[in-house]
A protein has these predicted regions:
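Conserved cytosolic catalytic loops of P-type ATPases
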Residues: 47-65, 69, 73, 215-217, ...
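Transmembrane helix-loop-helix hairpins at the membrane interface
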Residues: 14, 107-255, 366
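Juxtamembrane coupling segments of multi-pass membrane pumps/enzymes
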Residues: 11-12, 18, 22-24, 96, ...
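Membrane-embedded alpha-helical bundles of multi-pass transporters
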Residues: 131-146, 175, 194, 435, ...
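Flexible metal-binding regulatory segments at protein termini and peripheral loops
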Residues: 1-147, 263-264, 344, 348-356, ...
Length: 770
C-alpha cells in the first residue's frame, strides 16, 4: 500500500477554487453556538465572502474570500464590530499562545473555586434564620440586621465581579439584539440582585426585619459560580482537542544526518532540502520522505499505516517521515521536507476535518435568541399593563403601586431565570461523561455524547482494534519426526534477541510454555531474509522463502503453506542445511469481544465497515469471521478519510474506531471518532471518545449511555420549560386576579430553584446506568 504515491494534498488542493484566498482566524470572545451563528450569518451575507465556517471547539474561523471584492483586514473589522477579537493564525506564536491559554485556564479554575466557596458561605448565611443554623452573633439578623444584609451584599458583589465577563458579554450581545447564554445569565442574576437591593433598602427604610426572607443575593451568586465552573470544564475539553495536531507534528524528527562532502553532518530538520542525502542508522526515526538509494532494512511504519509488522525496504523503495528504521543503515534521497511530508499532510487533514465538522447546535442557545427578549418584553409589558390598570382605577391594589409593579417585573424575570434551562444539557452531560469514565469510556465532550446517539454506521480499523494488533503463533507444522515443542525450542533460540514482531512472537510463545532454550553459535541476521545459526553443531535457517532459496533449499512445500496463507496467516520457515523441516504460522488474533460487539451492533441495525492497510486476503478472512458487512483492504490514511467522508455524503452518521496515526484523519472527519486506549496518543487525541481498556465491547455501552443521556436531556429541557412557561403568567399577576395576592419574588425564586433541582435530580439518575 505504502509503495503507491499517497497524494494527501489532492483533497486540500481541490478546495481552493478560482482566485479565492483563505483566511484563518482565532476569534476571542466566542462563548456559545449563538455567537458562532451570528458571525457565520454576518460573513456569509458579506459580498466577496465565499465561505465562512467557525468552529466552537477551538474558536477558529476558516474563511474563503475573493480578494478583488474584499480584503482580509475588512473581514476582521466586520468581526470586531460584532464584539469579538479576531487574530490571524500566522500571527500567533504556538508557544506563547499555549502558555497564554494555560495561564487563562488556571485563572478560570481559581476564580471558579473562589466563587463556589463564597457562594456556599453566602447560602449558609442567608438560610441560617430559616433552619436555625449557627452564625456569628455579629451577623445574627434579629440583633444585627444591617450586618446580616451587608455581608450578603458584599459577598454577592464579590462573586459578580469575579464573573464580570458574563455581564460584559451578555449585556453587550443583548443590546446588539443577539442574546446568547451569557445574556440569560446576566439578565437572571441582575434581576435577583436588583430586587435584593430594593429589599435591602426597604428593610432599612421601613425597619422591617421580616423582609430579609425576600433577599436573593445568594441566588445571583450561586448561578454565577455554577456557570463559571461549567465554562471552565468546557474550556478544558476544548484545549484537549487541539493537542492532536501538535502531537502529529512532534512525531517528526527534529534533526537529520546529512551526507555532505563525504562526511555525515547533523542539521536541524528545517534546514534539509530536496535532493539532500540523509544517512539513517538502525533504530533511528526517519526524518523525511524519500527514496532509498543505498542499503536495505525493515521499517516500522506502524505510526503511519497502523500495521504491526515491519515492511521490508530495498533500494528505490520509498520511506516516510515518522516511521522507524529497524535493523539496517540507509541512505535516502529527500523528496519531501518538513511541511510536505506524509505525516504533515495527515496533520493538515486532521486540522481540516476538525474545522469543517459542524458543531452540534445547542438547543438552549437557539432558544435564547427568542427566549430572553421575549421574557424581558413580557416583564416590561406586564409591568406597564398593571401600572395602566392601577392608574386608571381598573383594578385596585392594597400596596404602593410602584412596589406592586416592580414586584410583577422582578417576579417574571426571576421565575423565568435561565438557570434550569442552562443546566438542562450540561448537567446531564456532566453526569453522563462521569458515568462513562467509571465504565472505562472517556468521552471528551458533550458534543460527542450527543452525536453518538445518532450513529447508524461504524467504521473499524482492523489492526489493534478488532484484532490484538500483535502477531501470535497459531500453528507449528513439523515436516519431519521432530515434535512441535522441539521446533518451537529451536526457533525461539534463534529469535532470543529479536526485535522483529514475528521473531518476538515466536520467542514469547516459548517463554509462555516455559521452554528452556539452546545456546546459538555463529549467529547471523540477514536483513529482509531471516537468521542463521548453529545449535549443537547443526546449522539452522529461520526466515522467509528468500533465505532458504539463497541457501539452495528448493522444496518449500508451497502448496501446503499456501493453504495457511489463504486463512490470512503469515509463515516462518525453519530448515537445516539440507531441507525444510517445519514452518510456523502466525496471525494477528481477533479480539475475543469483537464478535459479540458486531452481533450487538447488527441487532441495533448499525452497519459495520472494516478498513485496513493489510492485504485483501487477510482482511477478508477476519471480516467473514466477525460478520462485518463490508471490508476495504490495502487503504492509505487518505483512503480511510475519504471513505468516512463518502459515507457521510450518503447521509449516514458515521463513527470511526481506530488506534493508529493513520486513523487520525478519519477519526477527526467522522461524526464521532473512537480510539482504543491502548493505541497511539495521536489516535487518542484525535478521537472524541477513548476506550480506556482493550474491551471494544464498551463501544456498545457508550452508544447505550449516549442514548440514555440524550433522553435525559430532553426530559430536563421539558421540565425547565414547564417551570418557566407555567410560572410566567402566575408571576405576571394572574394569581392576583383570583386571590388578591401577588406571587412573591421569594416564591418565584423557589419555583426557579425547584426547576433547577428537578433538572439536577433527573440528571443524577444517570448514575444508576449499567
Amino acid at each position: 500500500m505504502m509503495e503507491n504515491d499517497i497524494k494527501l494534498g489532492t483533497e486540500l488542493d481541490d478546495r481552493q477554487e478560482k482566485d479565492n484566498k483563505k483566511l484563518e482566524l482565532k476569534i476571542d470572545g466566542i462563548s456559545c453556538q449563538a455567537c458562532v451563528a451570528k458571525i457565520e450569518r454576518k460573513l456569509s451575507r458579506t459580498d466577496g465572502v465565499e465561505k465562512a465556517l467557525v468552529n466552537i471547539s477551538n474558536n477558529m474561523a476558516d474563511i474563503e474570500y475573493d480578494e478583488k471584492e474584499i480584503k482580509a483586514s475588512e473581514i476582521m473589522k466586520i468581526i470586531e464590530k460584532l464584539g469579538y477579537t479576531p487574530k490571524r493564525r500566522e500571527d500567533l506564536k504556538d508557544k506563547e499562545e499555549a502558555l497564554r491559554a494555560e495561564k487563562k485556564l488556571k485563572s478560570e479554575l481559581t476564580k471558579s473555586k473562589i466563587a463556589i466557596v463564597l457562594s456556599l458561605i453566602l447560602m449558609y448565611i442567608s438560610m441560617s434564620h430559616m433552619f436555625g443554623l449557627p452564625v456569628p452573633h455579629i451577623i445574627y439578623p434579629v440583633d444585627h440586621i444591617f450586618n446580616y444584609v451587608a455581608i450578603q451584599f458584599i459577598i454577592a458583589v464579590t462573586v459578580m465581579i469575579i464573573g464580570k465577563r458574563f455581564y460584559k458579554v451578555g449585556f453587550r450581545q443583548l443590546f446588539m439584539l443577539s442574546p446568547n447564554m451569557d445574556s440569560l445569565v446576566a439578565v437572571g442574576t441582575s434581576s435577583a440582585f436588583i430586587y435584593s437591593l430594593y429589599i435591602s433598602y426597604k428593610i432599612f427604610a421601613d425597619n422591617n426585619i421580616h423582609l430579609m426572607h425576600s433577599l436573593y443575593y445568594e441566588s445571583a451568586a450561586m448561578i454565577i459560580a455554577f456557570v463559571m465552573l461549567g465554562k471552565y470544564l468546557e474550556t478544558l475539553s476544548k484545549g484537549k482537542a487541539s493537542a492532536a495536531i501538535k502531537k502529529l507534528v512532534n512525531f517528526q524528527a527534529k534533526k537529520a544526518n546529512i551526507i555532505r562532502n563525504g562526511e555525515i553532518v547533523e542539521i536541524d530538520i528545517n534546514e534539509v532540502s530536496k535532493g539532500d542525502i540523509v544517512f539513517i542508522k538502525p533504530g533511528e526515526k526517519i526524518p523525511v520522505d524519500g527514496r532509498i538509494i543505498e542499503g536495505h532494512s525493515t521499517i516500522d511504519e506502524a505510526m503511519i499505516t497502523g500495521e504491526s509488522i515491519p515492511v521490508e525496504k530495498l533500494e528505490n523503495d520509498k520511506v516516510y517521515s515518522g516511521s522507524i528504521n529497524k535493523d539496517g543503515a540507509l541512505k535516502v534521497i529527500v523528496n519531501a521536507t518538513e511541511g510536505e511530508t506524509l505525516i504533515s499532510k495527515i496533520a493538515k487533514l486532521v486540522e481540516d476535518a476538525q474545522m469543517t465538522k459542524a458543531p452540534i447546535a445547542r438547543l438552549a442557545d437557539k432558544v435564547s435568541l427568542i427566549f430572553v427578549p421575549t421574557v424581558i418584553f413580557i416583564a416590561i409589558f406586564a409591568a406597564l399593563l398593571w401600572w395602566f390598570l392601577i392608574k386608571y382605577n381598573v383594578v385596585s391594589v392594597n400596596q404602593n403601586s410602584f412596589e406592586f409593579v416592580l414586584t410583577i417585573f422582578i417576579s417574571i424575570l426571576i421565575i423565568a431565570c435561565p438557570c434550569s434551562l442552562g443546566l438542562a444539557t450540561p448537567t446531564a452531560i456532566m453526569v453522563g461523561t462521569g458515568k462513562g469514565a467509571e465504565l472505562g469510556i472517556l468521552i471528551k465532550s458533550g458534543e460527542a455524547l450527543e452525536k453518538l446517539n445518532q450513529i447508524d454506521t461504524i467504521v473499524f480499523d482492523k489492526t489493534g482494534t478488532l484484532t490484538e494488533g500483535t502477531p501470535k503463533v497459531i500453528d507449528i507444522v513439523s515436516l519431519t519426526n521432530i515434535d512441535k515443542d522441539e521446533i518451537l525450542k529451536i526457533a525461539a533460540s534463534m529469535e532470543v534477541s529479536s526485535e522483529h514482531p514475528l521473531g518476538k512472537a515466536v520467542y514469547d510463545e516459548a517463554k509462555e510454555k516455559n521452554i528452556n532454550l539452546y545456546d546459538v553459535k555463529n549467529f547471523l541476521s540477514i536483513s529482509g531474509r531471516g537468521v542463521i545459526g548453529e545449535i549443537e553443531a547443526k546449522k539452522y535457517l529461520l526466515g522467509n522463502k528468500k533465505l532458504l532459496l539463497d541457501n539452495n533449499i528448493k522444496d518449500l512445500h508451497e502448496e501446503e503453506i499456501h493453504k495457511y496463507e489463504l486463512q490470512g496467516k503469515t509463515t516462518i520457515l525453519l530448515a537445516d542445511e539440507e531441507k525444510l523441516i517445519a514452518f510456523i504460522t502466525l496471525a494477528d488474533v481477533v479480539r475475543n469481544e469483537s464478535l459479540e460487539l458486531i452481533k450487538k451492533l447488527k441487532k441495533e441495525n448499525i452497519k459495520t465497515y472494516m478498513l485496513t492497510g493489510d492485504n485483501e486476503r487477510t482482511a477478508r478472512v477476519i471480516a467473514e469471521k466477525l460478520g462485518i458487512d463490508d471490508v476495504i483492504a490495502e487503504v492509505s490514511p487518505e483512503d480511510k478519510y475519504k471513505k468516512v467522508k463518502e459515507l457521510q455524503e450518503q447521509g449516514k452518521k458515521v463513527a470511526m474506531v481506530g488506534d493508529g496515526i493513520n486513523d487520525s484523519p478519519a477519526l477527526a472527519q467522522a461524526d464521532v471518532g473512537m480510539a482504543i486506549g491502548s493505541g497511539t496518543d495521536i489516535a487518542i487525541e484525535s478521537a472524541d471518545i477513548v476506550l480506556m481498556g482493550k474491551d471494544i465491547e464498551t463501544i456498545f455501552t457508550a452508544i447505550r449511555l449516549s442514548r440514555a443521556t440524550i433522553k435525559n436531556i430532553k426530559e430536563n429541557l421539558f421540565w425547565a420549560f414547564f417551570y418557566n412557561t407555567c410560572g410566567i403568567p402566575i408571576a405576571g399577576g394572574l394569581l392576583y386576579l383570583f386571590t388578591g395576592h401577588l406571587l412573591n419574588p421569594m416564591i418565584a425564586g423557589l419555583a426557579m430553584g425547584m426547576s433547577s433541582v428537578s433538572v439536577v435530580s433527573n440528571a443524577l439518575r444517570l448514575k444508576r446506568f449499567k
